[in-house]
Structure formats: structure tokens, C-alpha cells
Regions:
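N-terminal amphipathic/basic-hydrophobic helices that include classical n-h-c signal peptides
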Residues: 1-12
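Class II aminoacyl-tRNA synthetase-like tRNA-binding/catalytic domains
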Residues: 11-133, 141-145
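Metal-assisted phosphate- and nucleotidyl-transfer catalytic regions
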Residues: 16, 162-167
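Residues that form generic nucleotide/phosphate-binding pockets
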Residues: 46, 159, 166
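Active-site nucleophile-His-acid catalytic modules used for acyl/amide transfer and hydrolysis
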Residues: 148
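A conserved active-site cap/scaffold subdomain adjacent to cofactor or substrate pockets
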Residues: 152-157, 161
Length: 167
């Protein structure tokens, strides 16, 4: 029987994962963490250069009812908590930054051809757990100002090519 709460939680979450029979990881835990760090640093530098993006810090939570936290498919329940010094106003952990990114582009007066990126952290309480999804989200998110003329398939292909070049 697990000796502490963390072990209980990990064992429960691990039951959702599918591991191929005989699987042996190539890296240990420390090597994996170092690899994640190196990949994130490399990609951050290259993506920002390729797409002309500036880094901005994403909020971990926003005030409920502000219309900033996107409801991805209409059924997500945001993780909420009261903020004591704001009269127990409810805050929500973000699960999507789509609206926030557009507000931020305007706030920073970003010109066409430039944009922003962030390393978003979120909690998605209603995520279906498995090899591809977890409760905790750590993902890159970016947005770029484009002109009406750029709204075409050729421009989209150019952006995709630049993203691949960043990798």
C-alpha cells in the first residue's frame, strides 16, 4: 500500500497510461528534466526569431466573469478559488489564452508581422486522462498580427514552414 498521498495520486493517474510491454526509458528522471529544459530553451529562441514574436508572461488565473478565460468546447469547468483581498472575488485558472492573447497584442501595440508567445501553464479538470492529456498543461501559445492580405492559404503554409524551421 502506498505510504503517502502523492504515491496514491500518482498510482491512480498512472492507471490511465498505456506503456508498451518491455518499454525501457532511454533517459532517467534527471536527464528527462534537463532534456525538457534544453528543448524549451532552443524552441523558444528559434520560434521567436522565425515568427518575430516577443515573450510575454501568461496569467495563471483570471477573474471570473471577465470573458477572458475561453470555454474550449462548452463543457469545461474552470478550477476556481476565492481571492480574500478582493472580497472573495472568484478567480479561474486559465485553460485557454485565445482571448487573452488578442487583448495582449492590442495592449502592447503589436504591429502586423509581429506577435507574442508565452509558455502557458494551466489545469484542465475535465480533461480525459491518458498518454496525450493530463490535468496539468504546459504548452507554448502564440499569436501574431496579420493583415487582411495575409489571410490566405499560402501565408499559412509559410508560417507552418517557419514553425518547422524553428524545430
Amino acid at each position: 500500500m502506498p505510504s503517502n498521498l502523492i504515491e496514491v495520486i500518482l498510482n491512480r493517474f498512472m492507471s490511465y497510461l498505456i506503456t508498451p510491454e518491455g518499454y525501457k526509458p532511454l533517459l532517467d528522471l534527471k536527464q528527462t528534466e534537463l532534456g525538457i529544459k534544453q528543448i524549451k530553451e532552443f524552441f523558444q529562441l528559434n520560434l521567436s526569431s522565425e515568427l518575430r514574436l516577443r515573450r510575454v508572461t501568461a496569467p495563471l488565473f483570471v477573474l471570473k466573469g471577465m470573458g477572458i478565460n475561453d470555454d474550449l468546447n462548452g463543457v469545461e469547468r474552470a478550477v476556481t478559488f476565492p481571492i480574500k483581498d478582493l472580497g472573495d472575488a472568484k478567480a479561474e485558472v486559465v485553460h485557454s489564452l485565445a482571448k487573452w492573447k488578442r487583448l495582449t497584442l492590442a495592449e502592447y501595440h503589436i504591429e502586423p508581422g509581429y506577435g507574442i508567445y508565452t509558455d502557458m501553464n494551466a489545469i484542465r479538470a475535465d480533461e480525459e486522462l491518458g498518454n496525450l492529456h493530463s490535468l496539468y498543461v504546459d504548452q507554448w501559445d502564440w499569436e501574431r498580427v496579420i493583415t487582411a492580405e495575409d489571410r490566405n492559404v499560402e501565408f499559412l503554409k509559410e508560417i507552418v514552414t517557419r514553425i518547422y524551421a524553428a524545430m
